[in-house]
């Protein structure tokens, strides 16, 4: 069987990569990423898995006559945190898939 050794080696490499990626996924779940808006008046914290775990709103951000501004600040901070989480995930997991042509990675 020619090439059997290459296939076996490739399978070992894939298993090793899967193990490393699982470890990185676990680390990402523990990461905390903060997005802010309004000069820090609103801060949203997410995990590396993009789960919102904290929202902080400073008192001066709350204006009963302008609720829309507060909503916009919360959205902006959330989007910033999510984008940072995406970048971190790509950075952490991408190094394990470099050179591979895997759709979605």
Swiss-Prot record:
Belongs to the YbaB/EbfC family. Its main location: cytoplasm. Binds to DNA and alters its conformation. May be involved in regulation of gene expression, nucleoid organization and DNA protection. Residues 7-16 have a biased composition (Low complexity). Residues 21-33 have a biased composition (Basic and acidic residues). Homodimer. The keyword Methyltransferase does not apply. InterPro entries: YbaB-like_sf, YbaB/EbfC. GO terms for cellular component: bacterial nucleoid; cytosol. This is Nucleoid-associated protein SaurJH9_0500. Keywords: Cytoplasm, DNA-binding. The keyword DNA-binding applies. It is found in: Cytoplasm, Nucleoid. PANTHER family: NUCLEOID-ASSOCIATED PROTEIN YBAB. It comes from the Bacteria. Pfam families: YbaB_DNA_bd. GO terms for molecular function: DNA binding. SUPFAM superfamilies: YbaB-like. Residues 1-33 are annotated as: Disordered.
């Amino acid at each position: 069987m020619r090439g059997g050794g290459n296939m076996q080696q490739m399978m070992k490499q894939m298993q090793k990569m899967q193990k490393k990626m699982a470890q990185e996924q676990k680390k990402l779940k523990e990461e905390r990423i903060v997005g802010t808006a309004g000069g820090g008046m609103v801060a949203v914290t997410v995990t590396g898995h993009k789960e919102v775990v904290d929202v902080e709103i400073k008192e001066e951000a709350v204006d009963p006559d302008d609720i829309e501004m507060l909503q916009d600040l919360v959205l902006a901070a959330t989007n910033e945190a999510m984008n940072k989480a995406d970048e971190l995930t790509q950075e952490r997991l991408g190094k394990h898939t470099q050179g591979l042509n895997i759709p979605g990675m």
